[in-house]
């Protein structure tokens, strides 16, 4: 029964060992049986927290454009230890993270916002920096990127032009 539960869970989507342990506990599988089944799945590499963490970071950083801080929290919630999480997060460069943040801000910047009006600019800054903070970006980085994008938008130039980035790399 425990093996069938684990297989069904892994068929739906990749899972960490802790997620599978929790699911087995929900189904009242004895701990020793759960441990034995999960150990066997780990031996045949069907349960591999390092591989799960790598996949999770790749997927979430591309689809949701989350920063390392948010990804680290998500991995911890899924039972991934700090060393494994750090290794998985190593695949994200500072440049990738900054480009993702810049792309988010440019996409969320409302067309028609009057950036010459100080109150409107402050409102846009707060809204965009808060959005980046919710995605795990550091406040200093968030405010810097928002200011750069707003300055570029106020000047009428796409923000990617003055940053030396190729907009084709943003997607």
Sequence positions of predicted segments:
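An alpha-helical, amphipathic repeat domain used for nucleic-acid recognition
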Residues: 1-171
């Amino acid at each position: 029964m425990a093996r069938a539960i684990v297989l069904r869970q892994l068929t739906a989507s990749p899972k960490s060992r802790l997620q599978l342990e929790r699911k087995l506990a929900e189904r009242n599988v004895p701990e020793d049986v759960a441990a034995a089944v999960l150990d066997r799945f780990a031996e045949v590499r069907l349960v591999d927290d390092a591989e799960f963490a790598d996949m999770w970071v790749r997927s979430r950083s591309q689809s949701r454009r989350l920063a390392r801080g948010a990804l680290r929290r998500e991995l911890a919630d899924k039972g991934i230890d700090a060393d494994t999480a750090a290794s998985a997060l190593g695949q994200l460069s500072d440049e990738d993270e900054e480009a993702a943040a810049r792309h988010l801000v440019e996409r969320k910047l409302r067309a028609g916002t009057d950036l010459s009006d100080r109150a409107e600019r402050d409102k846009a800054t707060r809204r965009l920096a808060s959005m980046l903070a919710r995605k795990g970006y550091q406040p200093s980085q968030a405010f810097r990127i928002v200011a750069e994008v707003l300055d570029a938008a106020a000047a009428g130039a796409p923000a990617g032009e003055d940053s030396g980035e190729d907009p084709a790399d943003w997607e």
